[in-house]
Amino acid sequence: MRIWFKKVPDGITSSVILSEDHLVDDLKDAIARKFPIRISQYYDAPELSIRVVAPPNASSELQSRELSPNESILFVMETYYPHGQDFNDALLVASPDTSVALRYRSSQLSSSTFESTPPVFSEYPPNIIPTPANETVPRIKQPSIALDSLESPVSAPSRHQSTYSYKGGPLNYNLRNASRTRSHQTLPSSNVNKTGVLLLPRSSRQQTLASRPSLPDLTSADKSQPSDEAESITRKNSIGMSTRSDESTAEKLAKAEVATPTNSRSISHSSLYTKQSGTAGVLPAVNADIDAANRMNPDISSQFPIADNKDPLNADTQAHLGFPSNQIDGIVGTSPVNVLTSPGIGAKAPFASLLEGVIPPINVLIVEDNIINQKILETFMKKRNISSEVAKDGLEALEKWKKKSFHLILMDIQLPTMSGIEVTQEIRRLERLNAIGVGAPKLTQPIPEKDQLNENKFQSPVIIVALTASSLMADRNEALAAGCNDFLTKPVSLVWLEKKITEWGCMQALIDWNGWCRFRGR
């Protein structure tokens, strides 16, 4: 049995299918399931109110009323609609925010009215439509629209058309959209006068600090003009870049030198980013503007003293850190960008980056039967100066691991002769048998000769990472239960793999520090 209902006040008409033994309470549950966002997200099903409307040609005994939860749907349909309920005889469903005592205007009820426009009620609460949970637009107070002031049925259609939009939705829904547009348009204007925060590099921060205009000296009128000129130069270059102007920077510097005597102890900010040999710095335009600001503000050197960098590290400090004296001399006065290219620093390895002294270079075993994947991983390791070997099947991987200890094994699960799960289980069995690892219990029984491992090569359990194209949780649990430390699903991002290798390498270096030092040749 199909039951038609109309959701008020938006006038959405829909239907549900119920059996003859269902009650009104079951109808409320079906309606709540029909509208999981607009009703179920905000109200419970028993909170809904269902109102039956008497047909225009019905007897005077039948009146519009609210249905009780324990009433039979079959009895209501046979009483009010003996010839069957159609689209125009829909029940009225209201939420708790809607007034229960909705007085239906029978004079407005007709087939054309129902097809063209939703019904008009005497009481129309304005804020009925709930806002979805993912809508972040703040709620505003909307103007209420009174519909009880209708005096004649003739004015009802015009008033009703002004209430509903062209899409059939209520007016307050359009008001919300309009307010959202207005609020979005007014957002930029509200932040015009607010001061923003700009994160600048070190040179720009020092420039901004050094270029603050000092307090005007009332005893000397000649110093005010250079201060104003310095302020204008600073305003043009406050973001760390030199801009063009009608007057060149050299002319401004010349005027500044004539107007203000040069301080012999001015701060040499450019020495922090340039070489002492007199070569050009990283930002020559910025350094020139900083020097100009220093000449115009000689008191800054006393407020922010900078230590002389001729002797940054004494002999005791150099000996304690283990740096040769020639390397320290090469670092002094060198730009941070060119530190790796300085003599004795960063030029000894192809993987020349700031992470050279941080990432432990580990030895990786790649177990992969696909030739393309082998070449990709091999090239990836070579570019990052990571020592690696390749095994084509599980048996070859097990033999290579026995002969040479590895820090990390990238294990493919689907392998010929021996699967990755079987190889992992065998490796963990041999590690337990030979008591590899900190705190591993040693067996009292003698170890078979084929299962014995070199104690000098194996100091800690190897990190095994499973690689597979399957994303099933069962495969992941099986790999972790076999002894894998991590589980990666193909295709793997090389950028993310590099981060994980860094993590695993640092972890292995901490676990087996002595073995890693031997691997480094220390």
UniProtKB/Swiss-Prot annotation:
It is found in: Cytoplasm. Residues 244-255 have a biased composition (Basic and acidic residues). Residues 148-274 are annotated as: Disordered. GO terms for biological process: negative regulation of G2/M transition of mitotic cell cycle; phosphorelay signal transduction system; positive regulation of p38MAPK cascade. InterPro entries: CheY-like_superfamily, Sig_transdc_resp-reg_receiver. The modification 4-aspartylphosphate is found at D412. Pfam families: Response_reg. One of its GO terms (cellular component) is cytoplasm. Residues 174-194, 260-274 have a biased composition (Polar residues). Gene3D superfamilies: 3.40.50.2300. GO terms for molecular function: phosphorelay response regulator activity; protein kinase activator activity. Its main location: cytoplasm. Keywords: Cytoplasm, Phosphoprotein, Two-component regulatory system. CDD domains: REC_hyHK_CKI1_RcsC-like. The keyword Transmembrane does not apply. The keyword Phosphoprotein applies. Residues 363-505 form the Response regulatory domain. Response regulator that coordinately controls the stress activated wak1-wis1-sty1 MAP kinase pathway and fission yeast cell cycle. This is Response regulator mcs4. It comes from Schizosaccharomyces pombe (strain 972 / ATCC 24843). The gene is mcs4.
